[in-house]
Each structure stands twice: as structure tokens, then as C-alpha cells.
């Protein structure tokens, strides 16, 4: 049996005491398997308790821990495990899988929608399938616009339009355009900055020097928002800075 655990906020003992779990042996083996998903959500103290449990039952159990950030797993656990790292899937692999899922579920998936799913998933197949599932729950025909709206992602051309407004139209039009993107796609300020940064390399109307300067402005804005700065004010400041850097 593979046990999938929810992220624990209060530690191993509290979660374990909430319900009784009976494990069956895996066929063909002499031990039991426990799978802990999102193990990096455990606090250091909870991981310390888990380490002791792993040692106590090492003769009868095998523990599999999955995480997004191995740096958040304490060294005492890492040193007792064989570490396997999985890279993001290639775009063609994600495309093939979501088309297969759509076909199996009788979902009409437009080609541009498939490309949008590949774009927003960043090689994460779980995210890709979830995006397809959410869109399909709203319409039997999954379109590109529907994917971007349901995943809270601004299309690349919209992001490029904001930067073009900074370059040619000035502060107020660019500011209105950015606010429109935030409202339309339900984006947080940090999400907007990250998406702008991701798409910056594909912007043809900026030279390398301008892209470097814009990247620095985005980094400063992201840092200030993470540190607690007001989102609206920081985004306005970023827009003003970008306009001064690349504007006519």
C-alpha cells in the first residue's frame, strides 16, 4: 500500500493520532511501504520526529518522501535516503499526455489550447492535467483563452502589450493596461512580475541592454513586495521605472 499524506502543520504525532491507519504488505516483499507527499511542508521538529520513526521501523518499513524543495528536508533524513531528482518533462511529452487524456475523456481540445497548457505547466504534468480538468469542467470545448483565464496566467501577447505601452504610450496608459491584466486574470503582484520576467526574453522590440535594465526593475519590485511593500504602489513604481528606462 502507498500512503499519501496531507501537508502537516502541527507535526507527525498530531497527524498520526487523528486516525488509525492499517498498512498491508506489498506483494512480493517482506516490508511495508509508506509514501509521504509534500514532505517539505513538515516543520523541522516534525521531520526530526519522522526520522526517529524511520529508524525504529527500518526493518519492516520503507519510507518514500516526495518534495518540491530538497533543501527543506533536514540533513538527518537526507543522509538516510537515496535521493532521486526528476527534471521537468519536455514540452512534447506534456503535449502528448494532455492530448491523450482529452481523447480518453471525450474533451475537444483545440491545438492552441494544448499549446497554452504546455506554456503554463512549465513541464509539470500534474499542473497540466489540472489545467485541462478545470477548463473542461466549464466547457466541453477547451480553448486557449479558457486555459489562460482558469490558470490565472496572462497570455504572452498581453504581457508584451504592457511593455509596448511602457515604451510608446507612457505611464498612465501602461498603468491602466497593467491593472486591466491584474483584474482580468486574477493575478497577484508577484505573479505578474514573474510572468513578465519569464516572457521578457521573447520581446523583440527591446534590445539586450533594455532587457537587463527592466529585469533589475522587476527584481527590485518583487523583493519589495515579498518584504511587505504595498502591491499597488510597488507595481506603479515598477511601471514608472520601466517607462523611464525604455520610453521614448
Language model regions located:
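C-terminal helical "lid" of AAA+/P-loop NTPase domains
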Residues: 114-120, 126-140, 148, 163-164, ...
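Conserved AAA+ ATPase "SRH/arginine-finger" region at the nucleotide-binding site
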Residues: 68, 82-95
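Helix-rich C-terminal "collar"/helical-bundle subdomain used as an assembly and partner-interaction module
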Residues: 161-248
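Short glycine-/polar-rich loops that comprise or flank the Walker A/P-loop
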Residues: 30-31, 58-61, 78-82, 123, ...
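Short glycine-rich substrate-engagement loop in P-loop NTPases that contacts/grips substrate
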Residues: 1-32
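Short conserved motifs of the RecA-like P-loop NTPase core
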Residues: 31, 95-97, 108-120, 142-148, ...
Amino acid at each position: 500500500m502507498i500512503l499519501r499524506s496531507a501537508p502537516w502543520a502541527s507535526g507527525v504525532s498530531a497527524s498520526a493520532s487523528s486516525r488509525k491507519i492499517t498498512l498491508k504488505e506489498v506483494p512480493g516483499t517482506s516490508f511495508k511501504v509508506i509514501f509521504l507527499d509534500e514532505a517539505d511542508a513538515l516543520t523541522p521538529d516534525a521531520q526530526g520526529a519522522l526520522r526517529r520513526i524511520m529508524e525504529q521501523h527500518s526493518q519492516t518499513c520503507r519510507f518514500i518522501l516526495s518534495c518540491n524543495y530538497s533543501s527543506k528536508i533536514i540533513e538527518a533524513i537526507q543522509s538516510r535516503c537515496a535521493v532521486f531528482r526528476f527534471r521537468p518533462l519536455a514540452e512534447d511529452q506534456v503535449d502528448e499526455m494532455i492530448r491523450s487524456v482529452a481523447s480518453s475523456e471525450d474533451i475537444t481540445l483545440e491545438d492552441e489550447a494544448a499549446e497554452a497548457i504546455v506554456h503554463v505547466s512549465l513541464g509539470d504534468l500534474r499542473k497540466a492535467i489540472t489545467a485541462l480538468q478545470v477548463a473542461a469542467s466549464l466547457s466541453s470545448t477547451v480553448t486557449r483563452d479558457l486555459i489562460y483565464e482558469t490558470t490565472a496566467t496572462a497570455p504572452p501577447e498581453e504581457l508584451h502589450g504592457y511593455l509596448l505601452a511602457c515604451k510608446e504610450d507612457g505611464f498612465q496608459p501602461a498603468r491602466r493596461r497593467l491593472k486591466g491584466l491584474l483584474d482580468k486574470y486574477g493575478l497577484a503582484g508577484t505573479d505578474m512580475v514573474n510572468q513578465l520576467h519569464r516572457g521578457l526574453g521573447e520581446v523583440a522590440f527591446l534590445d539586450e541592454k533594455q532587457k537587463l535594465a527592466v529585469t533589475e526593475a522587476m527584481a527590485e519590485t518583487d523583493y519589495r513586495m515579498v518584504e511587505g511593500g504595498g502591491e499597488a504602489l510597488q507595481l506603479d513604481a515598477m511601471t514608472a521605472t520601466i517607462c523611464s528606462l525604455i520610453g521614448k
